[in-house]
Structure formats: C-alpha cells, structure tokens
Amino acid sequence: GEGLRAPRCAERSLSYADSFIELIEKNKSNFFVHKINKYPNLLEIEKIFKNYRDKNIDLVLSIGGGSVIDAGKLFSSCKTSGSKLNDISNLKNRSPQNSIFTIAIPTTSGSGAESTKFATIWSEETKQKFSYENENLLPEVVYLIPEYTKSLNYDLTLTTTLDALCHAVDSLLNKNSNHESIRLSKEAIEKTNSNFSLLLENLENIDYRAEALYAS
C-alpha cells in the first residue's frame, strides 16, 4: 500500500523530532510534517486544514507542548480520513467515529493537554481565546518520554510544574469532582510536592522528570 500518511505537528527547532522522522522513513511510510508556532492561532490552524484538505490522513502525531497537542487534536477531530475539512464551530456535534487516530507526545509537564477532551486556540482577529470540548479530542495513545522534557530550563520547568499543580488543585476543588478525579488530583499533588524541589535542583535527572510528567 501507500503506507502511513501522518501530518506531524511539532514545535520549531526540536531536534528530538528527527528520531521520529528517521523511524518513519525507515518504515517507508508517507508522511507530512507541519511545524507550528509556539502559540498557534485560529488562522494557523485553518492553514493546516487547507494544506491537508485533500490528503488521505490515517494518523496524526503531535510532538510538543500543550498548544501543539491541541492543534493536533483539533485537526484530527475536524478532518475525517479521506474527507474534507469540517467547520470547527460544529465540533461539538461530531462523533468519535469521525476523528483520525491520534498519538500525543508531550514535551512539557504542565497543561496535561495530552490527557484531556479539551482544546484551546487563540484568535488573532477577535483577540479571543476559544475552548472546545468533545470526547473525540482525547488522543487514542499518549507516550510519556521524560527525556523529551530535559531541554526545559529552570524557569520553564518551574512554571510548567506549577501549572500542573494548579490544574490538580482546581480539579480537586471542582464542584463536579468525583471519586476518580479526586484520587487523581491528590496523587498529582502528592507527586509534585515530593518531587518539585528535587527536580529544580537536578534538572537533568530523568527520574524526577518522569515523576513531573506523570503528575501533569
């Protein structure tokens, strides 16, 4: 067959993405690479849709931070394999059967975008932030690779870990919380509290990176 067709969303200048390109090339798969800006806006997402409107996509692989992963989630949910683009505004009416298989690989340990059914995008024209919710926004597969977070400097490690902690506290105190969400929130808070200072003092430590990534 023609092999795999996968538009990959990745942040600019990330050398670790080269390993995936090499792997796909060795397997003689057809793929398309699309690098997006750090903070993609609605126009950029629409540009991605336009570029791949007539492509038969079987897989979306997103490697990067929350914005990159959200972009991949929106793309896979609004473009069915073998079909044309569907309007983002109609996303909430889409069924899970109409999404493309998605793999997310986070390179930060903050927002946890890889494990949610939400996606957020900024509109430069209206100066508004849009949030979308749909079950089919949740990636089918997530790989947590702590080595990919080693490039985060002290400040980014600090801010993203605090971001994860804030999400956990917010989930714990949410009026719609349940036994499972409370359990996960407490686990995330405990892991962050026991690991945070150690990670900041040892940014190269893979074990601490792994704990932070899991907590997020």
Annotate the PLM regions.
Residues 12, 37-40, 153, 157, ...:
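Catalytic cores of large soluble enzymes that bind and process phosphate-bearing ligands
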